[in-house]
Amino acid sequence: MLILVPSILIAIGDPVPLPTSVEDFLQPGTQPDDMIQMLDPLSSSNTCQACHGDYLQESFHEPWDGWVGNLMAQSARDPIWHAALTIANQDATDSGEYCIRCHAPVGWYRGHSLPSDGSALEDGFFENDFDGVNCQICHRAVSPVAVPGDPVEDDAVRAALEFPPGDGYGNGRLILDPVDSRRGPYSDIPNAPGMNLHSPTPAIHSPFHQRS
């Protein structure tokens, strides 16, 4: 439609998005294809609540409560983000896939980021794409850069990557352990046989998890 204004000709219509594709937004780090080889799937936060929540009367002291009310837990449910996702796709074709990588990483790693409008994301009890940045995403993360004191398991995970992130590890360029070996900041974790209820493998002390 054309609107005539003195000395101005204004064209009004649907905006035309930039002709981009998923490849234009490719970032290094662990890829969805790598997840196919994952020995252990990314569990939802529901599997964590049984032990890490609902055991104290003052629940704000519990790890579960500290996560469930923060922005990480809501990153894939936030209506403002969903509105921004729509705008991103209107501006550049399939650019929303890049947004999903950070805001709904479980869904992204499970291969549910296309269509890039988030319509393929699934809400399940054991695997929930709407979990946001959940417990598994953080506690299975591997330091992208080797530093003194790194657990020995990290070297093998980094070496197996097809697209290592190098020194620039922002923008969702996470590296995830394909095995459910949880990492954390504490060095006094009981690791006797049968003590790790998450996995047959021991929990891992990770200096990477001592800084945010």
PLM region descriptions:
Residues 12-45, 49-131, 140-211:
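Sequence context of c-type cytochrome heme-c attachment sites
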Residues 1-15:
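Sec-dependent, cleavable N-terminal signal peptides
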Residues 134-135:
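Short beta-strand-alpha-helix junction that forms the catalytic/metal-binding core
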